[in-house]
Amino acid sequence: MSDKTVKSTNLMAFVATKMLERQEDLDTCTEMQVEKMKTSTKARLKTESSFAPRTWEDAIKDKILRRSVDTSSLDKWQELKQELENVSDALKADSLWLPMKSLSLYSKVSNQEPSSIPIGEM
């Protein structure tokens, strides 16, 4: 074998060895990243699962919201909705009944006089 072939073979072996070492470093790094992600995900799940899912209605009931919210209109809403459902079909067929009824309901919920409600606000 010639000296040139031996040198090129040694050089190729050196490059291949370095590439394999680099690949092992990358694999180790990737494994470490995956383990870190798993650990942080488990920690996050422990933290998040300790809180029960809540709705804004629950927060209002528990008075946790920073601003006080007037819930009196929420109480009226069920009553007004029931009243609307109880109206006969004959009245619903009247073309003026629905706009007038919605204006009346809006004024009850918003505590405003019907004449003071801007048209675009309904």
Curated annotation (Swiss-Prot):
Q: Where is this motif: Nuclear export signal?
A: 96-105
- Pfam families given in the database record: Flu_C_NS2
Q: Domain of life of the organism in this record? A: Viruses
| Cellular-component GO terms for this entry | host cell nucleus; virion component
Q: Where is the signal peptide?
A: none
Query: Where does the protein principally reside?
Result: virion
Q: Which UniProt keywords apply?
A: Host nucleus, Host-virus interaction, Transport, Virion
* Compartments where found: Virion; Host nucleus
Q: Which InterPro entries match?
A: Flu_C_NS2
Q: What does this protein do?
A: Mediates the nuclear export of encapsidated genomic RNAs (ribonucleoproteins, RNPs). Acts as an adapter between viral RNPs complexes and the nuclear export machinery of the cell. Possesses no intrinsic RNA-binding activity, but includes a C-terminal M1-binding domain. This domain is believed to allow recognition of RNPs to which the M1 protein is bound.
Q: How does it assemble?
A: Binds M1 protein. May interact with human nucleoporins and exportin XPO1/CRM1.
Q: What is this protein called?
A: Nuclear export protein
Q: Which organism is it from?
A: Influenza C virus (strain C/JJ/1950)
